[in-house]
Amino acid sequence: MARLNITPLYSSLDNWPGRLFEAEGATIFNARTATSFVFTYPPGHDFAGFRVAVTGTGFAYSLGLPSAGSISSVVVRNGAGQPVLVFNSFTPNTLASDLSQFAASVFGGRDALGNGPGANGRGAWSILLSGNDVINCTNGNDRRSVEGLNSGNDRFNMLAGDDSVAGGIGNDTIFGGSGVDEISFEETSHNLGDSAFRGISVNMATGRLIDCWGGTDTFFDIERIIGSRFNDVFVGNAGRNDFSGLRGNDVFNGGGDQDRVRYGDDYWQGGRQGIVVDLETSNIGGVIRGAIRDGFGNRDVVINIERVNGTRYNDVFVGSSERNVFIGAEGRDSFNGMGSRDAISFDVSYTGVAQTGIIVNLQLAANQIVNDGFGNVETAISIEDIWASDQNDRLIMNGADNFVFGRDGADTMTGGGGRDTFSWEDEDEFGSGDRITDFVAVGTANLDRLGFDVEAFDNMTSTLRLVNGTSATTAAGVGQFVFNPLNDTLFWDENGSALGGSTAIVVLTNVAALSAANFDLF
């Protein structure tokens, strides 16, 4: 076994971490003793200036490279001398502690004519993590997984942050910690595909997962699962589940709450077509079954799934009798929410293409999405809610009770008829020049509301503090909403009557005053 301590520098590496253990070229040797073997990567290497220090016992050398020895630690430092990876606690007389085999992968065996095996960084990783290992991550976002086969019954301590673990061989135990954490088997479409032989079967309620090699993994505090290139089975729990199936004819059973299936990664794994979604082909006893053709042309079964992320291509979304949320992104998509209350979200680009502001008019009979931010005209039928982009959007809603989330950018929003709610969920969304053209502040029939996620804003609580006037009246440091009728603008003043801290939220055209009935603090 070995213990691997990953530092925050690992997730910020610019190049494939397999190259951390590939030493082809004019490698600089800093130490070759019976207990220490140290080398530095030369200019031109992906990790030029990085130093690998191996310590242990019984080190011997042949032609300048290790031929024997038992490893006790391997430390990788960057050019500034800061540790990136620290391996230690190796079990003696195992593959992982064999210096000769590790060095053979790191340096390869090519002669002067280029004949023989080259360096194999993936193989070196596989040797170091060939036992029952403990991998300790950081309190940051550890999105970069370890490399190699990573065989053995391993324990992953992911700690805080939004983390990602690559599923590997063995009966592993994964502690996600706080944050949004995932287990991914997408590497079965690449390096790990040669040894994998089956799809995963995961149950979020029991925290058990049969992996692609037949091992049984146990997990805690994991929120998202990414499947394999085979036929996968996903079973959710009572909370919100987040699944990606990738290739294969997959089965998704969401369970309770609002559950999501994502297809945006299909493109990166070779999927070259849009998805076709029908979330409700039958409804028997409250069990809602549907079908989705994925980005590879495979047919997935969905049970009690409410949210779907599409692809970069032209997707077709048909909803269910439950509340649905769809994300289409780059392609020319079509949306039909069917029953209940349904939303389209516009904050995703699957290929990194820059998005412009969206233009939506739900009062049109057809082509309600005039511009999806990528230049496409799209159909949106039976859609009540819009979650807009981070650009300058123009949104005209219909006669339903709509929910509008403008996000960043200077958004111009028209609620239309109905009791509409306009929402802000991040401080960055303030001060961007938002405007609501028809906000209804009085009356009972179509009274509109302004929604705020109080945890996202300094000094805001679920207790409303509001004044209609030109400045805050609360004590210093006590935040307050200020609606100034002289310019029709609502401000948030996080400092109260103290100087500074006032930021414009939205202009409410022709509104004289606001009251508690106009606010939803959640």
What are these regions (language model features)?
Residues 1-32, 46-47, 79-97, 132-133, ...:
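GD-rich hexapeptide-repeat beta-solenoids
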Residues 6, 137, 146, 176, ...:
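Extracellular beta-strand solenoids
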Residues 8-131, 477-481, 493-494:
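Mature extracellular "passenger" or substrate-interacting domains of secreted, surface-exposed proteins
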Residues 11-62, 271, 352-354, 419-522:
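Acidic glycine/aspartate-rich repeat arrays in secreted/surface proteins
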Residues 64-114, 216, 223, 299, ...:
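Low-complexity acidic/polar repeat-biased segments
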Residues 125-130, 235, 253, 413-414, ...:
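N-terminal helix-cap/turn-to-beta initiation motif at the start of protein domains
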Residues 130-132, 139-141, 148-153, 160-162, ...:
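Extracellular, beta-strand-rich repeat scaffolds characterized by small/acidic residue-biased motifs
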Residues 165, 174, 183, 200-204, ...:
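Fold-core signature of tandem repeat domains
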